[in-house]
């Protein structure tokens, strides 16, 4: 039986969460091993995304693109609400840049641990501004998932100083970015949205670099990558981020933010894997317990929403409420 939109959205978001830590790993390597400023890394990441998406739009609107996908909707260069999507891109760019600054000084897993306040913020924002119903099962799943993430990374109290405020600020900006995606994404082509997200990100980070050069802020200065490994890593970041965030846009077009929020915790599983492969950090026993909790939380929400989608509509109730607005 074909999956409904909510289940498809959860599967898409789970896939995106598996990709994003690869970009974070590349960003940390560029700032620590190659001495690129985090702001310049962020600008390069969004510049690469802009190039890839622009070329994709040009190809899709060419004769070749129409032959490959006949009858499919084509992405456009200008969305229906350009200003809204510029603001969305500014939030995305600013949040990414701040996160890259934090990950330069903090361990990758610990930075992500602090950032994981984002699903909590998203649940609250979606309930207040979008009117999403947040039932107790979703609330409990989010809390349990956050506790599992803390077990994975084992953050110390020393992290909650001035530097720890950076991933918290990034989490707030990214939660707002996702909220706007949910509110204004309907009817927009995901590829077009990513083009304008990249544009807004480049403008925002570009302004920060200019200010950073004027005031001498090292993390916000302009550093030019070489044509070897540094450019390759930035290109990888652009490809991964484009694929992941197009997937995120589609997911949030299909399902409410309050349902998808717990699945953000799956990112910590992928981050743990990349931490082992790249930095030789192998999880201990307590971390494996946390990973199991995170996976179990996502599976619980997945199976529950699947059951709600398959539940038959009562006879005579032609206007029954959608399953995504039930008791959690």
Regions found by a protein language model. Give the residues of each.
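Specific alpha-helical transmembrane segments that line the substrate/conduction pathway
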Residues: 40, 47, 100-130, 257-275
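Hydrophobic/aromatic residues within transmembrane alpha-helices
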Residues: 30, 41, 102-103, 108, ...
